[in-house]
Amino acid sequence: MGSENSALKSYTLREPPFTLPSGLAVYPAVLQDGKFASVFVYKRENEDKVNKAAKHLKTLRHPCLLRFLSCTVEADGIHLVTERVQPLEVALETLSSAEVCAGIYDILLALIFLHDRGHLTHNNVCLSSVFVSEDGHWKLGGMETVCKVSQATPEFLRSIQSIRDPASIPPEEMSPEFTTLPECHGHARDAFSFGTLVESLLTILNEQVSADVLSSFQQTLHSTLLNPIPKCRPALCTLLSHDFFRNDFLEVVNFLKSLTLKSEEEKTEFFKFLLDRVSCLSEELIASRLVPLLLNQLVFAEPVAVKSFLPYLLGPKKDHAQGETPCLLSPALFQSRVIPVLLQLFEVHEEHVRMVLLSHIEAYVEHFTQEQLKKVILPQVLLGLRDTSDSIVAITLHSLAVLVSLLGPEVVVGGERTKIFKRTAPSFTKNTDLSLEDSPMCVVCSHHSQISPILENPFSSIFPKCFFSGSTPINSKKHIQRDYYNTLLQTGDPFSQPIKFPINGLSDVKNTSEDSENFPSSSKKSEEWPDWSEPEEPENQTVNIQIWPREPCDDVKSQCTTLDVEESSWDDCEPSSLDTKVNPGGGITATKPVTSGEQKPIPALLSLTEESMPWKSSLPQKISLVQRGDDADQIEPPKVSSQERPLKVPSELGLGEEFTIQVKKKPVKDPEMDWFADMIPEIKPSAAFLILPELRTEMVPKKDDVSPVMQFSSKFAAAEITEGEAEGWEEEGELNWEDNNW
């Protein structure tokens, strides 16, 4: 054995050993790399036999022959290390009829290989020389009795008689006239021994094998292999075509072993009906014998197999609907047999293999352990993101989405996460308890050209339904829906910021640049917006808001030309003492009417977020909106004194038209640069601002007990002032416009 005597021990023996009838002990062992093996321990006096067996095992390589690993000399004897196997005598009780039939076929192939390719004879084919590997295949061992056909002399046979099975010795060797068999009949001795072994195994076969086939096979054995005349025993290859070896399991196994030799037509026909043939087999047989043959690169490359068979093997059995074909394996068998194979396939970097694995990942991924998912599956799946194949990248992204539910986004995606998408959705069912920002003044506080989204039925969620007359047409494009503003308030839109209300129609001069950017309060700013609204609509509109005492709902329904809306509550102010004006530029002016010869401004800054107090319900309000196509867009409610109701002024005009404000359209700005724009003086308004005559466009004749209503251009929406004590310019120190000193 040469250098093997000094070789370090590279395995560890496990207890207990199994002792063969010949006295040979077989130990299970574990190699240094973690693989399993079997160690045959021979006595030192049998060193020649061990060397002979090791020589044959090294030179003879066949799937049905025991695979040799190493041979060393130890203190307790000579150790022959092979692949992990167990004696057939131990495993026979756990095997099914199909496995026994397939095992007999394996031993038959091994003997044919020895006879035809090696020109050797085994000389001891018996139960103790057959072993079962981990994958279920039967392996032929006991190679210490193997010799060439010409060397099987009577003397050699007598030398190995102590380790031979007496039942396997043919009758001709008992004759004193026995001589060496000729080369053409060298297989006769092994044929008889094989016939004896098969006959003993047929007794354990159950009803899975047809009685007719079994009876026919037994007759063939007696007439051929067990024939007492050696020359009448045919070669073992003649048994390969017998019906005993024509079962579904064996045919599937044989076809898969020779898959590379089959034509495309044969493979298509085979995989097309493979599911029907495999379904009749036991789950244990499929898991132990067929799974390694079906889950490999060759089968994954067959389109028919991928479409018609693999979906039923790549997932465990589950509750299925009526008429659906269930999967082949139970969850327990799938976990123990299929998952280890899939782990190995994930390390195969072939495109067609990865496509098949990821296409069915949802069916089996939950059967991996957390450690397997993190250390094997996830790293291998992530490799697909860097592949040049678009299909690999697409299926990889889909698989990562599946892994998120098992490993969590922190493991799959990595890094810190932040809330980017907020849960905001428009709500179309809200109560009518309106705060200041829900009031009609705030809802209709901006010109429709400033807001691009124009929604239909804007007041349906603001006012009670009883105020809508069935015969009153409403042009929904002229209004702005309250839900739009609610959405802006929720999402942090500039409209949700506190609005600074101007005094006397003039914006606060102390507004910062940030405020001017966030809220378009000037008409100039609004003109710079793109015209996303309806361009074909008339530019001039007049909207009058009048405050009336409460009337029954039936009276309101009788008005067909106006839209009267009754508000249940107003916040933060009293209806009898507050006038609210909305200018076209988006600013809101709030003033108190003159009651005792002095007028005081209302604070210009009202917060939309502070808690509001309910208004007094002594004077409920109605809001009437009248549209005119020839007037500019303006909304201005008339003033109502706290002591008296507004009196109706008899005139030739229509009802309420005396309060209509005639507004001139703002002139278009000169495109040329104004070199003196920075020289315009900045004049802060006093407590009461005197309206200059040039700013007035129309004055309604003063009537008794009626406050005059003045109309101004769209540039200034100044409050009505009747006092003349407040002066914009000093009377005594009038400015000299010709003076060059200032």
Swiss-Prot record:
Residues 506-544, 568-598, 629-652, 723-742 are annotated as: Disordered. The protein kinase domain is predicted to be catalytically inactive. The keyword rRNA processing does not apply. HEAT repeats lie at residues 199-238, 285-323, 333-370, 372-409. It is found in: Cytoplasm; Golgi apparatus; Cell projection, Lamellipodium. The modification Phosphoserine is found at residues 439, 707. Ubiquitously expressed. Pfam families: PK_Tyr_Ser-Thr. Residues 548-742 are annotated as: Interaction with EZR. InterPro entries: ARM-like (IPR011989), ARM-type_fold (IPR016024), CIK-Related_Protein (IPR051177), HEAT_type_2 (IPR021133), Kinase-like_dom_sf (IPR011009), Prot_kinase_dom (IPR000719), Ser-Thr/Tyr_kinase_cat_dom (IPR001245). A lipid is attached at residue 2 (N-myristoyl glycine). Interacts with EZR/VIL2 C-terminal domain. This is Protein-associating with the carboxyl-terminal domain of ezrin. The keyword Repeat applies. Its main location: cytoplasm.
